[in-house]
Amino acid sequence: MAEQQQEQQIRVRIPRKEENEILGIIEQMLGASRVRVRCLDGKTRLGRIPGRLKNRIWVREGDVVIVKPWEVQGDQKCDIIWRYTKTQVEWLKRKGYLDELL
């Protein structure tokens, strides 16, 4: 019997440039819903997990996330918008979205 390998379609959320979203990697957990995030633009920001996502997404060091910098202090602070799963991170690597970050 010949095994057929079918590639499953994966829907992956991409950062929206028009909404000022950036890819980032969690570097350190700080507590009180705060994390240190290394962003794709080369800056390290203090990330906040908003209350609406606090119990829905659990983040760990090394997770790839989408962040949205604040309008005030945008170079220093941001909000976590989305966390990627392992299969989504593999897809992002294959497509070249994480080349500069990793």
Curated annotation (Swiss-Prot):
GO terms for cellular component: cytoplasm. Pfam families: eIF-1a. GO terms for biological process: translational initiation. Transmembrane segments: none annotated. PROSITE patterns: IF1A, S1_IF1_TYPE. GO terms for molecular function: RNA binding; translation initiation factor activity. Residues 10-85 form the S1-like domain. The keyword Ribosomal protein does not apply. Keywords: Initiation factor, Protein biosynthesis. Seems to be required for maximal rate of protein biosynthesis. Enhances ribosome dissociation into subunits and stabilizes the binding of the initiator Met-tRNA(I) to 40 S ribosomal subunits. Belongs to the eIF-1A family. PANTHER family: EIF-1A. This is Translation initiation factor 1A. The lineage of its organism: Archaea, Methanobacteriati, Methanobacteriota, Methanomada group, Methanococci.
